[in-house]
Amino acid sequence: AGFDPAFIVLSPLDLSVDSIYNRGADIALQIRRMAFTERSGLTVSDMTGDIGMDASGISLAGVTLKAPFSRIEANISAGEGILALAPDSPLKADLMADVNTKDLKYLYPALIPPVLDGRIVSLALTAAGTLGDIGKAGLDISSPGHVAFTADGAARNVLDPGRMEASARFEGDFRDMAFLEALLSDSALR
């Protein structure tokens, strides 16, 4: 059936929180362990990290999520204007993931065709600057034996499409792309 955000059921839920702080709009949560299986079948075997929101902004520090075949790590901080999409809001993100399509299949079964079943995709994303001017961004995507792709760059006036400027450098090593043929319908692209 897949994941339905309107009907989330976690069972069983194993949750260990070191501390919770809440005062007005300020929230801080230190998750020492969280494990669950969602109704779709996706299992999170371990999640840890610190989550916070206060007058200075929002942060995820040392957040690690492990599923049976996947792992995601995130460190993200954003200034107080991030929710209002303020262009001058500071932004820093560092995200690393090794995702196996076996885990993704529980969320969106139709998204993973048989040719992609059991495929590992590694991703590293970094960004620093403000929401309006990303001074430095990087993206690395790879799938062992198939593709290794790197992009880095910067963008200015991101929230103003009429004034937006961006520069990027791309590099890729596409070793075995035969699986793409199975993903394309019978068309001129094939």
Predicted regions and their residues:
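Interface amphipathic segments
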Residues: A1-R190
